[in-house]
Amino acid sequence: MKQKNQHKKKKKRSCAAKPSGDGTTSDGNKKDVEEERKDGEGKREIENVGKNFIESLMEAFCSVSMEEAMAAYKEAGGDLNKAAEILSDLVESGDDPSTSSVASGSSGQETASTSEYGAGSSSSCSEDLTRDRWFKGSKQSRVIAATGMVSSVIAKDYLKPNPVRKEFPMMERSKELCGNGKKAADREKAEQFLSSMLGDDCELSMAVVRDVLCQCGYDVDMALNVLLDMSSSSTDDSLSGKCFGIGVSDSLAESSFDTDTSDCELFWGGDYSQRDYAKALMSSQDPFATTQGIDELGLPQKVLESLFNIRQNPKHESKTTSWRNVAKKMQSLGIDASSSSGEEPHPNTFVKDDSYHELRKGANDQWNVTKSYYQKAAEAYSKGGRAHAAYLSDKGRVASKQAQRADERASQDIFVARNKGIENVVTIDLHGQHVKPAMKLLKLHLLFGSYVPSIQTLRVITGCGASGFGKSKVKQSVVKLLEREGVRYCEENRGTLLIKLDGGSREFSFLDTESDSDE
C-alpha cells in the first residue's frame, strides 16, 4: 500500500510540474523564440539591403573603395541619396589638393583621432548640393560635413569651395553680349558700326574702339560719345580720359570679370578713371601719324631728318633728287599753307583778346553737328533701324570732314595771329661749296621756307669768289635760279643775298626736274 501511495504522489508531482496546454510558462518560451527568429531575419535583411546599397554605390563610383562606400553610407545614416552626394563630392574633389578631407565615422572615432593628434578642432559647414549625375531621384538637400583632424578616416578631399563670383555692375550688358556666339556676333557688328562712323581718316584704331566699347558695357551711345571726344581735336582734354564719364569705383579694381560672361582683356591699370588714351593711341597695332599735333619749333628738324635719311645700301642710291617727292614729304610733315593761301583771312585773325575762342567757334560748331548726327545714328542702330543708322552715319562722316577742315583753318589762323610781328630769318652759308651741291641745298631751303609760314627771310652767304670781285660761281647760279623762279631778293653785301619768302607754298619749276644744277 505504501508503495502504491508513494507512486501516486510522484505521479501527482510530475503532473503538477508539467504546464498545461494554455499555461503561461509554455507561451513565454514560444514568444521569445519567435522574437529571436524575427530579429535574426531583420538583421539579415538589413545587412542584405546595406550590402546591395554599398555595391550600388561602388558600381556608380568606380574610383571609390568598399571602405569609403561603407563610411559614406554610415555617415548618411542609411540614406542612399545622401551617401551618393558624399561620394560625388569625394570623387570631384579628389584631384584638388587645396580642399578639405572627408570626416566620416562615429563620434568615438573623432574623439580617438583628436586625442591622437592633439588639437583636433573640427568645424561644420553646410552647403546646398544638387547631384543628379548618378541618381535621377535625388533632390536638393543640405549636407553636413565635419572638417578637422579626422581626415585620416578617409584620406581624400571631399569638398570643392565655390569661388566667389564678383562681377562689374557696369558690365551687365556685357554679360549678355558675350554669353554665346550670337551675342558675340552682335558685339562685333557694334564695333564695326562705330568704326565705320568714325571713318577711315580717324586716328583711332579698331583696338581702341573695341576697348572703349567694352569699358562702356557695350552701350553704343556711351561708347560713341567717348570715341567722339577722343577723335575731336577741338577739346584740349579729349585725350586725357578725364572728360569721358567712365567713372568706375575703387571696388572694381579688386574684382574681376566672370570667366563665363566676358572674354574682354583689359589692358589698362587699376585706376580706370585716369586712363591715358594718348598712350593707347600711340601703342596700338596700326597707329596713324598725326599732322595737327606737330610742334612748330621741332618741325625744321623733323623735315631735315626725313629728307636726309641715309639708306642702308648706298650702292643703289640715286644721284639725282626727286623734288616732287621732297615737296610731298614737306606737305605730310609740315603745315600745308596752300589750303588757305587762296582764301580770305578769318575776320578775327588779328584779334588779341579772346582770339582763341573766337577762332575755334566755327570748328566747335561743326563738331557739334557731327556729334548730333552720330548720336542719332547710334540711337537708330540700338533700335534696330540699320538703314537709317547708315544714312545718319554717312551724314556724320561728311560733317566730320568739314569739322576737320575747320580745325585746320582755325589752327592756321591762330598761328598767324600769334606769330604776327615775329620776323624769322634763316641763314645758310654756301661759301666753299661746289655749284651742284650748293644749288641742291638752296632748293631744299626754298621748299622748306615755302611750306613753313613762320620763316619770312632766307639769308644766303655765297662769298665773293676766288678773286674777291663778286664773281662767285655759286652766287651767279643762285641769282639765276631766283630770277627764273620769280623770287624776290636783294644784296645785303657783295657775298650775301636776302631772299624774301611769301609764307605760302608755291609751284617751283624745278619740282618736275631731277637736275640739281641751276638750269
Swiss-Prot record:
<dbReference type="InterPro" id="IPR055319">
    <property type="entry name" value="At5g58720-like"/>
</dbReference>
<dbReference type="InterPro" id="IPR056254">
    <property type="entry name" value="At5g58720/SDE5-like_UBA-like"/>
</dbReference>
<feature type="region of interest" description="Disordered">
    <location>
        <begin position="92"/>
        <end position="128"/>
    </location>
</feature>
<dbReference type="InterPro" id="IPR013899">
    <property type="entry name" value="DUF1771"/>
</dbReference>
<dbReference type="InterPro" id="IPR036063">
    <property type="entry name" value="Smr_dom_sf"/>
</dbReference>
<dbReference type="Pfam" id="PF08590">
    <property type="entry name" value="DUF1771"/>
</dbReference>
<dbReference type="InterPro" id="IPR002625">
    <property type="entry name" value="Smr_dom"/>
</dbReference>
<feature type="region of interest" description="Disordered">
    <location>
        <begin position="1"/>
        <end position="47"/>
    </location>
</feature>
<protein>
    <recommendedName>
        <fullName>SMR domain-containing protein At5g58720</fullName>
    </recommendedName>
</protein>
<feature type="compositionally biased region" description="Basic residues">
    <location>
        <begin position="1"/>
        <end position="15"/>
    </location>
</feature>
<feature type="compositionally biased region" description="Low complexity">
    <location>
        <begin position="98"/>
        <end position="127"/>
    </location>
</feature>
<feature type="domain" description="Smr">
    <location>
        <begin position="428"/>
        <end position="502"/>
    </location>
</feature>
<feature type="compositionally biased region" description="Basic and acidic residues">
    <location>
        <begin position="28"/>
        <end position="47"/>
    </location>
</feature>
<dbReference type="Pfam" id="PF24767">
    <property type="entry name" value="UBA_At5g58720"/>
</dbReference>
<comment type="subunit">
    <text>Interacts with PRL1.</text>
</comment>
